[in-house]
Amino acid sequence: RPVRDPAYRPLLFYCIIGGLTGGFASPFLSVYELRVLGLSHTFITSVGVVSAVVGMAGSWVWGRLADRTAWNCVIWLTAFLNLSCTLGWSFVRPSFAHLVAPVLIVVAAGCAGGASLASTNLQFALSPESGKTAYFGVTAAMSSIATCTSAAVGTAIQPMLEKSMGDSSISLLFFVAGIGGFANLIINGRKLPSVT
């Protein structure tokens, strides 16, 4: 039913395509940070702690912004920042990774809570009173399947690319994921209704 619902379908497609683009490079982030960029476990863990705090604060900030604007506005802003971070990973090099990586990690974490809040609120607002659980379930299932499928494809492609591109193969995956995410935001994100 969610697929056939014209009011809900733009959000469903946005979530599914977002899963496809989001899952493509995400399995490689830790490998990229450690093996390619040469960041230490201690460094990554320390930045992870900071990003967790920023993520909690981000949820509050994005919620306040949604109160003043609309949830689709929060999705656009958080997606823009998060996709900029994804794309940014493709340009990070070991010589300046210790300066740029924390920014990318913290900004992405700060956006995660807002994106989740916005998506959940849009799903709630756009689904019918009698079918909210089914709509939420279908959206979560289809997005998860898309994310897992995309991760599997990325994992299959990366070793083949590595033979000719070396460590740049992971950078290419981040680039493709970022561009695909921006395409989704431009094509499907603009169709999201304004809901407060």
Label the predicted regions.
Residues 80-96:
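C-terminal ends and interior cores of transmembrane alpha-helices
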Residues 114-128:
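Intracellular juxtamembrane helix-capping segments at the cytosolic ends
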